[in-house]
From Swiss-Prot:
GO terms for cellular component: Cul2-RING ubiquitin ligase complex; Cul5-RING ubiquitin ligase complex; cytosol; elongin complex; nucleoplasm; VCB complex. Residues 107-118 have a biased composition (Polar residues). GO terms for molecular function: transcription corepressor binding; ubiquitin protein ligase binding. SIII, also known as elongin, is a general transcription elongation factor that increases the RNA polymerase II transcription elongation past template-encoded arresting sites. Subunit A is transcriptionally active and its transcription activity is strongly enhanced by binding to the dimeric complex of the SIII regulatory subunits B and C (elongin BC complex). Residues 92-118 are annotated as: Disordered. It comes from Homo sapiens. Heterotrimer of an A (ELOA, ELOA2 or ELOA3P), ELOB and ELOC subunit. The elongin BC complex interacts with EPOP; leading to recruit the elongin BC complex to Polycomb group (PcG) target genes, thereby restricting excessive activity of the PRC2/EED-EZH2 complex. GO terms for biological process: positive regulation of proteasomal ubiquitin-dependent protein catabolic process; protein ubiquitination; protein-containing complex assembly; target-directed miRNA degradation; transcription elongation by RNA polymerase II; transcription initiation at RNA polymerase II promoter. This is Elongin-B. The lineage of its organism: Eukaryota, Metazoa, Chordata, Craniata, Vertebrata. CDD domains: Ubl_ElonginB. The modification N-acetylmethionine is found at M1.
Length: 118
């Protein structure tokens, strides 16, 4: 089965899918293809827990029930900086601006734009 993932680092977000049977290392290869950083310079995390390269995504807890297209699972990403890895840092998403008044729903029972269907 496919799992749907949101790989996040600082303000970067990658949406991808993979098989439950794919290994963490194979997921790092996907990241390498996008961000041009080799797997040995990457660390992937689930809930602040470092993921083992040899484990499958299913063994790490990513299943088709927990990582769905409409609600992808979050994977943290950290890169190697010189001899050590940077701390895991994921910036929160920004809040959208408030809707303009013309786009807010009207409280009236019927709208002037509604027409009777005959």
């Amino acid at each position: 089965m496919d799992v749907f993932l949101m790989i996040r680092r600082h303000k970067t977000t990658i949406f991808t899918d993979a098989k439950e049977s794919s290994t963490v290392f194979e997921l790092k290869r996907i990241v390498e293809g996008i961000l041009k950083r080799p797997p040995d310079e990457q660390r992937l995390y689930k809930d602040d827990q470092l993921l083992d390269d040899g484990k499958t995504l299913g063994e790490c807890g990513f299943t088709s029930q927990t990582a769905r297209p409409q609600a992808p699972a979050t994977v943290g990403l950290a890169f190697r900086a010189d001899d050590t890895f940077e701390a895991l840092c994921i910036e929160p998403f920004s809040s959208p601006p408030e809707l303009p008044d013309v786009m807010k729903p009207q409280d009236s029972g019927s709208s002037a734009n509604e027409q009777a269907v005959q």
